[in-house]
């Protein structure tokens, strides 16, 4: 079980209370698909992913980015038991979708980068530490079924 300080919980809750899901989600998933093109294989049904412009303008990518970002709400609501909160999604991604668990870390990094760009100076080292700790726990939970 992960131990969260009051400061970490405050920072994480503050980030999510101001998060623009419709902006951050599409940008983060688009970045992941552009920077790590091999991740596109899981999105073959999304239509044109031929280049960066097509990915950024793809409505399916945008919608899934929003869905993924809202998926983090599950962890936020279950900070004391994130692993169990993501057990079903871990099984889905490992057994049905066959997603390489390393892709969770790649997307996590992209979410962090987009969030940092959005928050600017407000994305302090302390904010980054708390957010990346949260994301690392979520990534670990999503990869749990693979172990």
From Swiss-Prot:
BP GO annotations: hydrogen peroxide catabolic process
InterPro entries: Globin (IPR000971), Globin-like_sf (IPR009050), Globin/Proto (IPR012292), Hemoglobin_b (IPR002337), Hemoglobin_oxygen_transport (IPR050056)
Boundaries of every Globin domain copy: 3-147
Gene Ontology MF terms in the entry: haptoglobin binding; heme binding; metal ion binding; organic acid binding; oxygen binding; oxygen carrier activity; peroxidase activity
Gene Ontology CC annotations of this record: blood microparticle; haptoglobin-hemoglobin complex; hemoglobin complex
Annotated CDD domains: Hb-beta-like (cd08925)
Alphabetized UniProt keyword annotations: Heme, Iron, Metal-binding, Oxygen transport, Transport
UniProt key word Metal-binding: yes
Tissue specificity note: Red blood cells.
Transport found in the keyword field: yes
Annotated residues for binding of heme b: 64, 93
Family, similarity comment: Belongs to the globin family.
Miscellaneous notes: This fish has two hemoglobins: Hb1 (major) and Hb2 (about 5% of the total). They display the Bohr and root effects.
Functional summary from the UniProt entry: Involved in oxygen transport from gills to the various peripheral tissues.
Subunit structure: Hb1 is a heterotetramer of two alpha chains and two beta-1 chains.
Stated name of the protein: Hemoglobin subunit beta-1
Originating organism: Cygnodraco mawsoni
Gene it is expressed from: hbb1
